[in-house]
Amino acid sequence: MKLQAVMETLIQRQQRARQELEARQAPPPPPPEPTGVRARTTMTDEDREPENARMHRTQMAALAAMRAAAAGLGHPSSPGGSEDGPPISGDEDTAREGTLSSPALHGSVLEGAGHAEGDRHLMDVGSDDDDTKSKWEEQELEELGEEEEEEEEEDDFEEEEEEEEGLGPPESASLGTAGLFTRKAPPAQAFRGDGGPRMLSGPERLGPGPAHPSHMASQMPPPDHGDWTFEEQFKQLYELDADPKRKEFLDDLFSFMQKRGTPVNRIPIMAKQVLDLFMLYVLVTEKGGLVEVINKKLWREITKGLNLPTSITSAAFTLRTQYMKYLYPYECERRGLSSPNELQAAIDSNRREGRRQSFGGSLFAYSPSGAHSMLPSPKLPVTPLGLAASTNGSSITPAPKIKKEEDSAIPITVPGRLPVSLAGHPVVAAQAAAVQAAAAQAAVAAQAAALEQLREKLESTEPPEKKMALVADEQQRLMQRAVQQSFLAMTAQLPMNIRINSQASESRQDSAVSLTSANGSNSISMSVEMNGIVYTGVLFAQPPPPTAPSAPGKGGVSSIGTNTTTGSRTGASGSTVSGGQVGLPGVSTPTMSSTSNNSLP
Protein backbone atom coordinates (compact mmCIF):
# COMPACT_ATOMS: atom_id res chain seq x y z
CA MET A 1 0.00 0.00 0.00
CA LYS A 2 2.87 2.33 0.77
CA LEU A 3 4.36 1.69 -2.64
CA GLN A 4 1.00 2.22 -4.28
CA ALA A 5 0.63 5.64 -2.63
CA VAL A 6 4.07 6.65 -3.82
CA MET A 7 3.20 5.52 -7.35
CA GLU A 8 -0.03 7.49 -7.37
CA THR A 9 1.85 10.60 -6.26
CA LEU A 10 4.33 10.08 -9.05
CA ILE A 11 1.56 9.61 -11.58
CA GLN A 12 -0.11 12.85 -10.52
CA ARG A 13 3.16 14.71 -11.00
CA GLN A 14 3.53 13.18 -14.43
CA GLN A 15 0.06 14.35 -15.35
CA ARG A 16 0.80 17.88 -14.24
CA ALA A 17 4.02 17.88 -16.25
CA ARG A 18 2.18 16.59 -19.27
CA GLN A 19 -0.47 19.31 -19.00
CA GLU A 20 2.20 22.01 -18.78
CA LEU A 21 3.94 20.62 -21.84
CA GLU A 22 0.69 20.45 -23.77
CA ALA A 23 -0.06 24.04 -22.80
CA ARG A 24 3.27 25.09 -24.22
CA GLN A 25 2.53 23.00 -27.33
CA ALA A 26 5.85 21.34 -27.27
CA PRO A 27 6.68 19.41 -30.49
CA PRO A 28 6.35 15.63 -30.19
CA PRO A 29 9.58 13.82 -29.37
CA PRO A 30 11.35 11.57 -31.87
CA PRO A 31 10.91 7.77 -31.65
CA PRO A 32 12.63 5.92 -28.78
CA GLU A 33 16.35 5.47 -29.21
CA PRO A 34 19.04 3.58 -27.26
CA THR A 35 19.67 4.81 -23.74
CA GLY A 36 23.00 6.50 -24.43
CA VAL A 37 21.68 8.40 -27.42
CA ARG A 38 18.58 9.40 -25.49
CA ALA A 39 20.72 10.70 -22.65
CA ARG A 40 22.86 12.87 -24.93
CA THR A 41 19.93 14.34 -26.82
CA THR A 42 17.88 15.01 -23.72
CA MET A 43 20.77 16.73 -21.93
CA THR A 44 21.14 19.16 -24.80
CA ASP A 45 17.40 19.76 -24.65
CA GLU A 46 17.55 20.38 -20.91
CA ASP A 47 20.31 22.94 -21.36
CA ARG A 48 17.83 24.89 -23.41
CA GLU A 49 14.84 24.19 -21.14
CA PRO A 50 15.84 24.39 -17.46
CA GLU A 51 12.27 24.17 -16.17
CA ASN A 52 11.75 20.80 -17.84
CA ALA A 53 14.96 19.52 -16.26
CA ARG A 54 13.88 20.75 -12.82
CA MET A 55 10.59 18.89 -13.09
CA HIS A 56 12.39 15.71 -13.97
CA ARG A 57 14.75 16.09 -11.04
CA THR A 58 11.79 16.14 -8.73
CA GLN A 59 10.33 13.13 -10.49
CA MET A 60 13.56 11.20 -10.21
CA ALA A 61 13.73 12.02 -6.51
CA ALA A 62 10.31 10.46 -6.14
CA LEU A 63 11.57 7.46 -8.07
CA ALA A 64 14.49 7.11 -5.70
CA ALA A 65 12.09 7.14 -2.76
CA MET A 66 10.02 4.50 -4.49
CA ARG A 67 13.08 2.29 -4.97
CA ALA A 68 13.96 2.63 -1.32
CA ALA A 69 10.46 1.55 -0.33
CA ALA A 70 10.60 -1.32 -2.82
CA ALA A 71 13.93 -2.46 -1.40
CA GLY A 72 12.37 -2.53 2.05
CA LEU A 73 9.45 -4.64 0.90
CA GLY A 74 11.69 -7.24 -0.79
CA HIS A 75 10.98 -9.65 -3.64
CA PRO A 76 8.25 -12.00 -2.31
CA SER A 77 5.98 -9.25 -1.03
CA SER A 78 2.76 -10.32 -2.78
CA PRO A 79 1.68 -12.24 -5.91
CA GLY A 80 0.34 -9.14 -7.53
CA GLY A 81 3.37 -7.06 -6.75
CA SER A 82 5.88 -8.65 -9.05
CA GLU A 83 6.69 -5.19 -10.24
CA ASP A 84 8.36 -4.62 -6.84
CA GLY A 85 11.06 -7.14 -7.70
CA PRO A 86 14.75 -6.42 -8.04
CA PRO A 87 15.47 -2.86 -9.03
CA ILE A 88 16.00 -2.35 -12.67
CA SER A 89 16.71 0.57 -14.94
CA GLY A 90 14.67 3.70 -15.12
CA ASP A 91 13.52 2.76 -18.58
CA GLU A 92 11.71 -0.28 -17.27
CA ASP A 93 10.36 1.59 -14.27
CA THR A 94 8.91 4.28 -16.45
CA ALA A 95 7.41 1.76 -18.85
CA ARG A 96 5.95 -0.20 -15.94
CA GLU A 97 4.51 2.99 -14.51
CA GLY A 98 2.68 3.48 -17.77
CA THR A 99 1.33 -0.03 -17.45
CA LEU A 100 0.28 0.43 -13.83
CA SER A 101 -1.46 3.67 -14.56
CA SER A 102 -3.76 1.94 -17.01
CA PRO A 103 -6.46 0.75 -14.59
CA ALA A 104 -6.26 3.86 -12.41
CA LEU A 105 -6.72 6.36 -15.22
CA HIS A 106 -9.08 4.25 -17.38
CA GLY A 107 -6.57 3.75 -20.19
CA SER A 108 -5.61 7.39 -20.57
CA VAL A 109 -1.90 6.65 -20.38
CA LEU A 110 -2.19 3.91 -23.04
CA GLU A 111 -3.78 6.29 -25.55
CA GLY A 112 -2.14 8.94 -27.75
CA ALA A 113 -0.84 11.55 -25.32
CA GLY A 114 -0.12 9.05 -22.56
CA HIS A 115 2.24 7.14 -24.79
CA ALA A 116 3.87 10.32 -25.96
CA GLU A 117 4.51 11.31 -22.34
CA GLY A 118 5.81 7.83 -21.52
CA ASP A 119 8.25 8.04 -24.40
CA ARG A 120 9.31 11.50 -23.27
CA HIS A 121 10.06 10.18 -19.81
CA LEU A 122 12.08 7.38 -21.32
CA MET A 123 14.08 9.93 -23.26
CA ASP A 124 14.62 12.14 -20.25
CA VAL A 125 15.96 9.45 -17.97
CA GLY A 126 19.58 10.30 -18.70
CA SER A 127 19.12 13.97 -17.79
CA ASP A 128 19.50 13.41 -14.06
CA ASP A 129 22.61 14.42 -12.20
CA ASP A 130 25.73 12.28 -11.99
CA ASP A 131 24.92 10.68 -8.64
CA THR A 132 21.59 9.29 -9.78
CA LYS A 133 23.09 8.23 -13.09
CA SER A 134 25.93 6.35 -11.44
CA LYS A 135 23.41 4.60 -9.19
CA TRP A 136 21.45 3.46 -12.25
CA GLU A 137 24.62 2.24 -13.92
CA GLU A 138 25.44 0.08 -10.92
CA GLN A 139 21.96 -1.39 -10.99
CA GLU A 140 22.15 -1.96 -14.72
CA LEU A 141 25.45 -3.81 -14.34
CA GLU A 142 23.77 -6.23 -11.96
CA GLU A 143 20.99 -7.25 -14.35
CA LEU A 144 22.36 -6.31 -17.75
CA GLY A 145 21.37 -9.46 -19.61
CA GLU A 146 17.82 -9.50 -18.28
CA GLU A 147 17.36 -5.83 -19.02
CA GLU A 148 18.30 -6.13 -22.69
CA GLU A 149 15.75 -8.85 -23.32
CA GLU A 150 12.99 -7.17 -21.36
CA GLU A 151 13.65 -3.81 -22.99
CA GLU A 152 13.05 -5.25 -26.44
CA GLU A 153 9.93 -6.98 -25.21
CA GLU A 154 8.71 -3.77 -23.56
CA ASP A 155 9.11 -1.87 -26.83
CA ASP A 156 7.19 -4.52 -28.72
CA PHE A 157 4.53 -4.55 -26.03
CA GLU A 158 4.11 -0.78 -26.11
CA GLU A 159 3.82 -0.79 -29.89
CA GLU A 160 1.15 -3.45 -29.70
CA GLU A 161 -0.69 -1.49 -27.00
CA GLU A 162 -0.64 1.57 -29.25
CA GLU A 163 -2.23 -0.41 -32.06
CA GLU A 164 -4.87 -2.08 -29.90
CA GLU A 165 -5.54 1.12 -27.83
CA GLY A 166 -5.92 -0.70 -24.57
CA LEU A 167 -8.34 -3.42 -25.78
CA GLY A 168 -6.53 -6.21 -23.95
CA PRO A 169 -7.77 -7.64 -20.63
CA PRO A 170 -7.16 -5.21 -17.76
CA GLU A 171 -5.95 -7.89 -15.39
CA SER A 172 -2.78 -8.33 -17.42
CA ALA A 173 -1.71 -4.83 -16.43
CA SER A 174 -1.24 -5.88 -12.82
CA LEU A 175 0.76 -9.02 -13.53
CA GLY A 176 4.12 -7.31 -13.86
CA THR A 177 6.76 -9.23 -15.78
CA ALA A 178 4.60 -12.34 -16.02
CA GLY A 179 1.83 -10.32 -17.58
CA LEU A 180 4.23 -8.94 -20.13
CA PHE A 181 5.35 -12.40 -21.18
CA THR A 182 1.81 -13.70 -21.50
CA ARG A 183 0.90 -10.79 -23.70
CA LYS A 184 4.00 -11.42 -25.80
CA ALA A 185 2.78 -14.74 -27.22
CA PRO A 186 0.41 -13.43 -29.92
CA PRO A 187 3.01 -11.08 -31.44
CA ALA A 188 5.44 -13.99 -31.61
CA GLN A 189 2.92 -16.09 -33.52
CA ALA A 190 2.15 -13.22 -35.83
CA PHE A 191 5.86 -12.80 -36.44
CA ARG A 192 6.16 -16.45 -37.37
CA GLY A 193 3.24 -16.13 -39.70
CA ASP A 194 4.56 -12.98 -41.31
CA GLY A 195 7.73 -14.51 -42.21
CA GLY A 196 8.15 -16.09 -45.36
CA PRO A 197 7.58 -16.75 -48.94
CA ARG A 198 6.36 -20.17 -47.87
CA MET A 199 3.23 -18.66 -46.43
CA LEU A 200 2.61 -16.87 -49.68
CA SER A 201 2.75 -20.09 -51.67
CA GLY A 202 0.02 -21.54 -49.54
CA PRO A 203 1.00 -25.17 -48.96
CA GLU A 204 1.05 -24.75 -45.17
CA ARG A 205 -2.73 -24.64 -45.00
CA LEU A 206 -3.05 -28.35 -44.52
CA GLY A 207 -5.57 -29.99 -42.29
CA PRO A 208 -4.48 -31.46 -38.97
CA GLY A 209 -2.31 -34.46 -39.63
CA PRO A 210 0.73 -36.27 -38.35
CA ALA A 211 3.08 -33.86 -40.12
CA HIS A 212 1.42 -30.70 -38.79
CA PRO A 213 3.19 -30.18 -35.42
CA SER A 214 6.66 -30.74 -36.81
CA HIS A 215 5.84 -28.48 -39.70
CA MET A 216 4.78 -25.67 -37.39
CA ALA A 217 8.00 -26.09 -35.48
CA SER A 218 9.99 -25.96 -38.70
CA GLN A 219 8.57 -22.53 -39.56
CA MET A 220 10.83 -20.77 -37.07
CA PRO A 221 14.06 -20.95 -39.12
CA PRO A 222 14.26 -19.00 -42.37
CA PRO A 223 12.14 -20.64 -45.07
CA ASP A 224 13.86 -22.76 -47.65
CA HIS A 225 12.58 -23.70 -51.09
CA GLY A 226 14.34 -27.05 -51.18
CA ASP A 227 12.70 -30.41 -51.64
CA TRP A 228 12.46 -30.99 -47.91
CA THR A 229 9.64 -28.46 -47.72
CA PHE A 230 7.52 -30.59 -50.02
CA GLU A 231 8.32 -33.68 -47.98
CA GLU A 232 7.14 -31.91 -44.84
CA GLN A 233 3.97 -30.53 -46.38
CA PHE A 234 2.94 -33.70 -48.22
CA LYS A 235 4.22 -36.30 -45.82
CA GLN A 236 1.08 -38.39 -46.18
CA LEU A 237 1.48 -38.45 -49.94
CA TYR A 238 5.13 -39.43 -49.75
CA GLU A 239 4.54 -42.24 -47.27
CA LEU A 240 1.70 -44.07 -49.03
CA ASP A 241 4.18 -46.74 -50.07
CA ALA A 242 7.91 -47.37 -50.16
CA ASP A 243 8.34 -47.11 -53.93
CA PRO A 244 11.50 -45.05 -54.59
CA LYS A 245 9.97 -43.73 -57.79
CA ARG A 246 7.24 -42.06 -55.77
CA LYS A 247 9.59 -39.53 -54.18
CA GLU A 248 11.28 -38.77 -57.48
CA PHE A 249 7.96 -38.27 -59.21
CA LEU A 250 6.46 -36.08 -56.49
CA ASP A 251 9.59 -33.93 -56.23
CA ASP A 252 9.64 -33.46 -59.99
CA LEU A 253 5.91 -32.76 -60.12
CA PHE A 254 5.92 -30.17 -57.35
CA SER A 255 9.00 -28.38 -58.67
CA PHE A 256 7.49 -28.34 -62.18
CA MET A 257 4.22 -26.88 -60.92
CA GLN A 258 6.12 -24.33 -58.83
CA LYS A 259 8.16 -23.18 -61.83
CA ARG A 260 5.02 -23.11 -63.96
CA GLY A 261 3.43 -20.64 -61.56
CA THR A 262 0.66 -22.96 -60.34
CA PRO A 263 2.04 -24.51 -57.14
CA VAL A 264 0.26 -27.44 -55.57
CA ASN A 265 -1.19 -25.73 -52.52
CA ARG A 266 -3.25 -28.57 -51.07
CA ILE A 267 -3.59 -32.32 -51.12
CA PRO A 268 -6.60 -33.54 -53.14
CA ILE A 269 -8.92 -35.70 -51.06
CA MET A 270 -11.24 -38.36 -52.44
CA ALA A 271 -13.38 -40.81 -50.45
CA LYS A 272 -12.00 -39.39 -47.19
CA GLN A 273 -8.43 -40.32 -48.07
CA VAL A 274 -5.49 -38.73 -49.82
CA LEU A 275 -5.71 -39.09 -53.58
CA ASP A 276 -2.58 -40.90 -54.73
CA LEU A 277 -1.30 -38.60 -57.47
CA PHE A 278 1.59 -40.91 -58.28
CA MET A 279 -0.59 -43.98 -58.92
CA LEU A 280 -3.19 -41.90 -60.75
CA TYR A 281 -0.52 -40.61 -63.14
CA VAL A 282 0.93 -44.09 -63.67
CA LEU A 283 -2.46 -45.68 -64.39
CA VAL A 284 -3.60 -42.95 -66.79
CA THR A 285 -0.35 -42.85 -68.74
CA GLU A 286 -0.34 -46.65 -69.03
CA LYS A 287 -3.76 -46.41 -70.69
CA GLY A 288 -2.43 -43.90 -73.22
CA GLY A 289 -3.04 -40.59 -71.48
CA LEU A 290 -6.02 -38.59 -70.31
CA VAL A 291 -7.59 -38.20 -73.75
CA GLU A 292 -7.53 -41.95 -74.38
CA VAL A 293 -9.05 -42.66 -70.98
CA ILE A 294 -11.87 -40.20 -71.67
CA ASN A 295 -12.56 -41.51 -75.17
CA LYS A 296 -12.47 -45.17 -74.15
CA LYS A 297 -14.23 -44.57 -70.82
CA LEU A 298 -11.64 -46.38 -68.72
CA TRP A 299 -12.34 -44.57 -65.45
CA ARG A 300 -13.75 -47.69 -63.79
CA GLU A 301 -10.40 -49.42 -64.23
CA ILE A 302 -8.61 -46.35 -62.90
CA THR A 303 -10.89 -46.35 -59.84
CA LYS A 304 -10.13 -49.99 -59.14
CA GLY A 305 -6.41 -49.40 -59.58
CA LEU A 306 -6.52 -46.64 -56.96
CA ASN A 307 -8.38 -48.93 -54.51
CA LEU A 308 -11.26 -46.49 -54.32
CA PRO A 309 -14.74 -47.77 -53.52
CA THR A 310 -16.81 -48.39 -56.62
CA SER A 311 -19.87 -46.84 -54.97
CA ILE A 312 -18.50 -43.32 -55.37
CA THR A 313 -20.90 -41.19 -57.39
CA SER A 314 -19.36 -39.27 -60.28
CA ALA A 315 -15.97 -40.86 -59.67
CA ALA A 316 -15.02 -40.39 -63.32
CA PHE A 317 -15.76 -36.67 -63.22
CA THR A 318 -13.86 -36.17 -59.96
CA LEU A 319 -10.80 -38.09 -61.14
CA ARG A 320 -10.81 -36.24 -64.46
CA THR A 321 -10.97 -32.80 -62.84
CA GLN A 322 -8.26 -33.63 -60.29
CA TYR A 323 -6.02 -35.03 -63.02
CA MET A 324 -6.55 -31.97 -65.20
CA LYS A 325 -5.69 -29.66 -62.30
CA TYR A 326 -2.64 -31.40 -60.86
CA LEU A 327 -1.23 -33.81 -63.45
CA TYR A 328 -2.28 -32.96 -67.02
CA PRO A 329 0.23 -30.10 -67.54
CA TYR A 330 2.95 -32.44 -66.28
CA GLU A 331 1.79 -35.18 -68.68
CA CYS A 332 1.88 -32.78 -71.64
CA GLU A 333 5.37 -31.60 -70.70
CA ARG A 334 6.97 -34.95 -69.89
CA ARG A 335 5.11 -37.42 -72.09
CA GLY A 336 3.34 -35.36 -74.75
CA LEU A 337 0.53 -37.91 -75.09
CA SER A 338 -2.05 -35.30 -76.11
CA SER A 339 -2.66 -31.60 -76.47
CA PRO A 340 -5.14 -29.32 -74.70
CA ASN A 341 -7.17 -28.99 -77.91
CA GLU A 342 -7.54 -32.76 -78.12
CA LEU A 343 -8.56 -32.85 -74.48
CA GLN A 344 -11.26 -30.24 -75.03
CA ALA A 345 -12.56 -32.12 -78.06
CA ALA A 346 -12.71 -35.36 -76.05
CA ILE A 347 -14.60 -33.65 -73.22
CA ASP A 348 -17.11 -32.10 -75.64
CA SER A 349 -17.64 -35.42 -77.41
CA ASN A 350 -18.14 -37.22 -74.11
CA ARG A 351 -20.64 -34.57 -73.02
CA ARG A 352 -22.65 -34.94 -76.24
CA GLU A 353 -22.68 -38.71 -75.91
CA GLY A 354 -23.87 -38.40 -72.34
CA ARG A 355 -26.83 -36.28 -73.42
CA ARG A 356 -27.70 -38.54 -76.35
CA GLN A 357 -27.15 -41.92 -74.76
CA SER A 358 -30.06 -43.75 -73.16
CA PHE A 359 -29.27 -45.74 -70.06
CA GLY A 360 -31.79 -48.52 -70.77
CA GLY A 361 -29.24 -50.73 -72.48
CA SER A 362 -31.28 -51.52 -75.59
CA LEU A 363 -30.32 -54.57 -77.61
CA PHE A 364 -30.60 -52.65 -80.87
CA ALA A 365 -28.62 -49.73 -82.18
CA TYR A 366 -29.76 -47.62 -85.07
CA SER A 367 -27.61 -46.61 -87.94
CA PRO A 368 -27.12 -42.83 -87.99
CA SER A 369 -27.98 -42.71 -91.68
CA GLY A 370 -31.49 -42.02 -92.89
CA ALA A 371 -34.16 -44.29 -94.25
CA HIS A 372 -32.76 -44.11 -97.79
CA SER A 373 -29.56 -45.86 -96.77
CA MET A 374 -31.40 -48.41 -94.66
CA LEU A 375 -33.95 -49.40 -97.27
CA PRO A 376 -33.03 -50.35 -100.83
CA SER A 377 -34.18 -48.56 -103.91
CA PRO A 378 -37.46 -49.80 -105.33
CA LYS A 379 -35.80 -50.50 -108.67
CA LEU A 380 -34.59 -54.03 -109.23
CA PRO A 381 -31.36 -54.60 -111.16
CA VAL A 382 -33.05 -56.41 -114.08
CA THR A 383 -31.49 -55.40 -117.38
CA PRO A 384 -33.91 -56.40 -120.19
CA LEU A 385 -36.83 -57.21 -117.95
CA GLY A 386 -39.58 -54.92 -116.69
CA LEU A 387 -41.36 -55.96 -113.50
CA ALA A 388 -44.11 -54.31 -111.53
CA ALA A 389 -44.82 -55.81 -108.12
CA SER A 390 -47.08 -54.86 -105.28
CA THR A 391 -48.48 -56.57 -102.26
CA ASN A 392 -51.73 -58.44 -102.30
CA GLY A 393 -53.96 -55.71 -100.97
CA SER A 394 -51.72 -54.97 -97.98
CA SER A 395 -48.33 -53.45 -97.38
CA ILE A 396 -45.41 -55.04 -95.64
CA THR A 397 -44.09 -52.93 -92.79
CA PRO A 398 -40.62 -51.73 -93.70
CA ALA A 399 -37.93 -52.32 -91.14
CA PRO A 400 -34.57 -50.62 -90.72
CA LYS A 401 -31.20 -52.24 -90.78
CA ILE A 402 -30.90 -54.02 -87.46
CA LYS A 403 -27.50 -54.15 -85.87
CA LYS A 404 -27.16 -57.03 -83.46
CA GLU A 405 -24.54 -57.61 -80.80
CA GLU A 406 -22.09 -59.30 -83.14
CA ASP A 407 -22.31 -56.26 -85.43
CA SER A 408 -23.70 -58.28 -88.35
CA ALA A 409 -25.97 -55.96 -90.23
CA ILE A 410 -29.08 -57.56 -91.72
CA PRO A 411 -30.61 -55.42 -94.44
CA ILE A 412 -34.37 -55.88 -94.34
CA THR A 413 -35.82 -55.14 -97.75
CA VAL A 414 -39.44 -54.39 -98.43
CA PRO A 415 -41.16 -55.10 -101.71
CA GLY A 416 -43.08 -52.09 -102.86
CA ARG A 417 -44.63 -51.17 -106.16
CA LEU A 418 -41.84 -51.85 -108.62
CA PRO A 419 -43.06 -50.70 -112.01
CA VAL A 420 -40.66 -51.09 -114.88
CA SER A 421 -41.32 -50.87 -118.55
CA LEU A 422 -41.20 -53.49 -121.22
CA ALA A 423 -38.65 -52.72 -123.88
CA GLY A 424 -41.00 -53.30 -126.79
CA HIS A 425 -44.04 -51.35 -125.47
CA PRO A 426 -43.65 -47.56 -125.32
CA VAL A 427 -47.17 -47.02 -123.90
CA VAL A 428 -46.53 -49.40 -121.08
CA ALA A 429 -43.17 -47.71 -120.49
CA ALA A 430 -44.80 -44.29 -120.05
CA GLN A 431 -47.43 -45.65 -117.70
CA ALA A 432 -44.83 -47.53 -115.74
CA ALA A 433 -42.68 -44.40 -115.37
CA ALA A 434 -45.60 -42.44 -113.95
CA VAL A 435 -46.49 -45.22 -111.57
CA GLN A 436 -42.84 -45.52 -110.59
CA ALA A 437 -42.62 -41.85 -109.59
CA ALA A 438 -45.78 -42.05 -107.53
CA ALA A 439 -44.68 -45.29 -105.94
CA ALA A 440 -41.28 -43.83 -105.05
CA GLN A 441 -42.89 -40.94 -103.20
CA ALA A 442 -45.30 -43.24 -101.42
CA ALA A 443 -42.47 -45.59 -100.52
CA VAL A 444 -40.41 -42.79 -98.98
CA ALA A 445 -43.34 -41.62 -96.87
CA ALA A 446 -44.20 -45.16 -95.84
CA GLN A 447 -40.60 -45.89 -94.97
CA ALA A 448 -40.31 -42.81 -92.75
CA ALA A 449 -43.57 -43.56 -90.95
CA ALA A 450 -42.75 -47.22 -90.50
CA LEU A 451 -39.26 -46.41 -89.31
CA GLU A 452 -40.62 -44.07 -86.66
CA GLN A 453 -43.12 -46.68 -85.50
CA LEU A 454 -40.46 -49.34 -85.28
CA ARG A 455 -38.15 -47.05 -83.34
CA GLU A 456 -40.89 -46.34 -80.83
CA LYS A 457 -41.55 -50.05 -80.45
CA LEU A 458 -37.92 -50.86 -79.91
CA GLU A 459 -37.43 -48.07 -77.41
CA SER A 460 -40.41 -49.22 -75.39
CA THR A 461 -39.88 -51.73 -72.63
CA GLU A 462 -40.49 -54.88 -74.62
CA PRO A 463 -39.07 -58.18 -73.44
CA PRO A 464 -36.10 -59.55 -75.39
CA GLU A 465 -38.20 -62.48 -76.66
CA LYS A 466 -40.42 -60.18 -78.72
CA LYS A 467 -37.42 -58.38 -80.14
CA MET A 468 -35.78 -61.62 -81.19
CA ALA A 469 -39.05 -62.79 -82.75
CA LEU A 470 -39.14 -59.58 -84.75
CA VAL A 471 -35.63 -60.27 -85.99
CA ALA A 472 -36.64 -63.80 -87.04
CA ASP A 473 -39.67 -62.49 -88.92
CA GLU A 474 -37.55 -59.99 -90.79
CA GLN A 475 -35.06 -62.69 -91.69
CA GLN A 476 -37.92 -64.78 -93.12
CA ARG A 477 -39.03 -61.89 -95.25
CA LEU A 478 -35.49 -61.42 -96.42
CA MET A 479 -35.33 -65.02 -97.63
CA GLN A 480 -38.62 -64.64 -99.49
CA ARG A 481 -37.30 -61.56 -101.18
CA ALA A 482 -34.17 -63.43 -102.21
CA VAL A 483 -36.26 -66.18 -103.80
CA GLN A 484 -38.19 -63.62 -105.80
CA GLN A 485 -35.04 -61.93 -107.05
CA SER A 486 -33.56 -65.29 -108.02
CA PHE A 487 -36.63 -66.13 -110.06
CA LEU A 488 -36.50 -62.78 -111.81
CA ALA A 489 -32.83 -63.27 -112.59
CA MET A 490 -33.68 -66.62 -114.18
CA THR A 491 -36.47 -65.20 -116.31
CA ALA A 492 -34.27 -62.32 -117.42
CA GLN A 493 -32.31 -64.76 -119.56
CA LEU A 494 -35.43 -65.71 -121.56
CA PRO A 495 -36.38 -63.72 -124.68
CA MET A 496 -39.83 -62.80 -123.49
CA ASN A 497 -41.85 -60.17 -121.68
CA ILE A 498 -43.18 -61.16 -118.25
CA ARG A 499 -45.99 -59.64 -116.26
CA ILE A 500 -46.68 -60.91 -112.75
CA ASN A 501 -50.11 -59.92 -111.49
CA SER A 502 -51.97 -60.76 -108.33
CA GLN A 503 -55.60 -61.81 -108.08
CA ALA A 504 -56.59 -58.55 -106.44
CA SER A 505 -59.52 -56.70 -107.91
CA GLU A 506 -57.64 -53.45 -108.23
CA SER A 507 -57.83 -52.32 -111.85
CA ARG A 508 -54.84 -50.00 -111.88
CA GLN A 509 -52.33 -52.39 -110.38
CA ASP A 510 -49.77 -53.17 -113.02
CA SER A 511 -48.35 -56.19 -111.29
CA ALA A 512 -48.01 -57.74 -107.87
CA VAL A 513 -46.20 -60.46 -106.01
CA SER A 514 -47.92 -62.07 -103.05
CA LEU A 515 -45.53 -63.50 -100.49
CA THR A 516 -47.21 -65.16 -97.56
CA SER A 517 -46.03 -67.62 -95.00
CA ALA A 518 -49.25 -68.51 -93.20
CA ASN A 519 -49.28 -72.13 -94.30
CA GLY A 520 -47.20 -74.57 -96.28
CA SER A 521 -49.31 -74.47 -99.48
CA ASN A 522 -47.93 -71.21 -100.82
CA SER A 523 -47.68 -70.75 -104.55
CA ILE A 524 -47.14 -68.14 -107.20
CA SER A 525 -49.78 -67.71 -109.87
CA MET A 526 -48.36 -65.89 -112.87
CA SER A 527 -48.90 -65.19 -116.52
CA VAL A 528 -46.24 -64.77 -119.16
CA GLU A 529 -46.77 -63.10 -122.52
CA MET A 530 -44.40 -64.13 -125.26
CA ASN A 531 -44.88 -62.55 -128.69
CA GLY A 532 -48.58 -62.01 -128.14
CA ILE A 533 -49.19 -65.36 -126.49
CA VAL A 534 -50.13 -65.31 -122.80
CA TYR A 535 -49.09 -68.20 -120.63
CA THR A 536 -50.59 -68.60 -117.19
CA GLY A 537 -49.65 -70.99 -114.45
CA VAL A 538 -49.07 -71.56 -110.80
CA LEU A 539 -45.63 -72.02 -109.32
CA PHE A 540 -45.25 -74.32 -106.35
CA ALA A 541 -42.16 -74.76 -104.25
CA GLN A 542 -40.71 -78.24 -104.51
CA PRO A 543 -38.06 -79.79 -102.32
CA PRO A 544 -34.82 -80.59 -104.10
CA PRO A 545 -34.55 -84.19 -105.30
CA PRO A 546 -31.96 -86.22 -103.43
CA THR A 547 -29.93 -86.98 -106.58
CA ALA A 548 -30.25 -83.60 -108.24
CA PRO A 549 -27.03 -81.54 -108.11
CA SER A 550 -27.46 -78.22 -106.40
CA ALA A 551 -25.92 -75.09 -107.78
CA PRO A 552 -25.27 -72.09 -105.51
CA GLY A 553 -28.10 -69.61 -105.75
CA LYS A 554 -28.92 -66.24 -104.30
CA GLY A 555 -30.47 -65.82 -100.88
CA GLY A 556 -30.78 -69.48 -99.99
CA VAL A 557 -32.07 -70.71 -103.37
CA SER A 558 -29.89 -73.59 -104.51
CA SER A 559 -31.17 -73.91 -108.05
CA ILE A 560 -34.12 -72.75 -110.03
CA GLY A 561 -35.42 -74.60 -113.03
CA THR A 562 -38.60 -75.19 -114.99
CA ASN A 563 -40.15 -78.60 -114.95
CA THR A 564 -42.79 -78.31 -117.63
CA THR A 565 -44.43 -75.46 -119.38
CA THR A 566 -47.34 -76.09 -121.70
CA GLY A 567 -49.60 -73.61 -123.32
CA SER A 568 -51.74 -72.84 -126.32
CA ARG A 569 -51.79 -69.72 -128.40
CA THR A 570 -54.85 -67.56 -127.87
CA GLY A 571 -54.03 -64.64 -130.09
CA ALA A 572 -53.66 -60.99 -129.40
CA SER A 573 -56.78 -60.85 -127.29
CA GLY A 574 -54.80 -62.28 -124.44
CA SER A 575 -57.20 -65.01 -123.37
CA THR A 576 -56.11 -67.47 -120.75
CA VAL A 577 -53.96 -70.34 -121.88
CA SER A 578 -53.54 -73.45 -119.84
CA GLY A 579 -50.33 -73.50 -117.99
CA GLY A 580 -48.13 -76.09 -116.51
CA GLN A 581 -46.22 -76.16 -113.32
CA VAL A 582 -42.88 -74.56 -112.76
CA GLY A 583 -40.88 -75.92 -109.89
CA LEU A 584 -38.23 -74.22 -107.81
CA PRO A 585 -36.02 -77.00 -106.51
CA GLY A 586 -33.69 -76.30 -103.64
CA VAL A 587 -35.79 -73.65 -101.96
CA SER A 588 -35.44 -73.95 -98.20
CA THR A 589 -37.67 -71.05 -97.31
CA PRO A 590 -41.47 -70.63 -97.31
CA THR A 591 -42.92 -70.89 -100.78
CA MET A 592 -44.12 -68.06 -102.97
CA SER A 593 -47.29 -67.73 -104.99
CA SER A 594 -48.74 -65.23 -107.39
CA THR A 595 -51.69 -65.19 -109.72
CA SER A 596 -52.17 -63.07 -112.78
CA ASN A 597 -54.83 -61.98 -115.19
CA ASN A 598 -54.46 -62.41 -118.88
CA SER A 599 -55.03 -58.97 -120.24
CA LEU A 600 -52.62 -56.23 -121.06
CA PRO A 601 -53.38 -52.73 -119.83
Swiss-Prot record:
Q: Where is the composition biased (Acidic residues)?
A: 139-166
Q: Which GO terms describe its molecular function?
A: chromatin binding; DNA binding; identical protein binding; transcription coregulator activity
Region named Disordered? 1-224, 545-601
Task: Give the residue ranges for region: Acidic.
Answer: 128-165
Span list, region Important for cytoplasmic localization: 542-562
Q: Where is this region: Homodimerization?
A: 495-518
Positions modified as Phosphoserine?
Answer: 78, 82, 89, 102, 127, 358, 367
**Domain ARID, which positions?**
243-335
Name the keywords, alphabetized.
Activator, Cytoplasm, DNA-binding, Isopeptide bond, Nucleus, Phosphoprotein, Transcription, Transcription regulation, Ubl conjugation
Instruction: Using the record's annotation, list all stretches that form the REKLES domain.
Output: 449-546
Effect noted on mutating residue 535 to A: Abolishes cytosolic localization
Subunit structure comment from the entry: Homodimer. Heterodimer with ARID3B. Interacts with E2F1. Interacts with GTF2I and BTK.
The record's function comment reads: Transcription factor involved in B-cell differentiation. Binds a VH promoter proximal site necessary for induced mu-heavy-chain transcription. Binds the minor groove of a restricted ATC sequence that is sufficient for nuclear matrix association. This sequence motif is present in matrix-associating regions (MARS) proximal to the promoter and flanking E mu. Activates E mu-driven transcription by binding these sites. May be involved in the control of cell cycle progression by the RB1/E2F1 pathway.
Instruction: Please give the name of this protein.
Output: AT-rich interactive domain-containing protein 3A
Originating organism:
Mus musculus
Organism lineage reads as: Eukaryota, Metazoa, Chordata, Craniata, Vertebrata
